[in-house]
């Protein structure tokens, strides 16, 4: 299995998020996720833009917060 086949996927009736390796995450997605996370959870969050774990964790925390 190559790296491109690995992904995290969350799905519910409101949204589907499928995020691959960091090179597969668009800068627009990162910007929007960062904006929402700062508004809803932590204004001081400044992720490493190349750390996929930062974004996966942010998605997980938002899903928990909004009970998605």
Listing of model-derived features with the role each one plays in the protein:
Residues 9-66:
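Acidic, low-complexity, intrinsically disordered interaction modules
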